From Swiss-Prot:
Membership in a protein family: Belongs to the universal ribosomal protein uL30 family.
Protein name as catalogued: Large ribosomal subunit protein uL30
Entry keywords, A to Z: Ribonucleoprotein, Ribosomal protein
The organism of origin for this protein: Psychrobacter cryohalolentis (strain ATCC BAA-1226 / DSM 17306 / VKM B-2378 / K5)
Gene Ontology terms: biological process: translation
GO cellular component: cytosolic large ribosomal subunit
SUPFAM superfamilies linked to this entry: Ribosomal protein L30p/L7e (SSF55129)
InterPro entries in the record: Ribo_uL30_ferredoxin-like_sf, Ribosomal_uL30_bac-type, Ribosomal_uL30_ferredoxin-like
Record's subunit section: Part of the 50S ribosomal subunit.
Amino acid sequence: MKKMKVTQFKSGAHRLKSHKACLKGLGLRRINHSVVVEDTPSTRGMVNRVNYLVKVEEA
């Protein structure tokens, strides 16, 4: 399955609870933290919801 690298570049503090939950679901904890996740519709949805907080690259 395809993978993608997601990097958090903005803080999750003072954001909507649902956006904080998406960051937690992706495994992101702090600024400049990167994780490699599978490219599935559910992870794409989480990334799209917090697209102003993260950068996405192919892994």
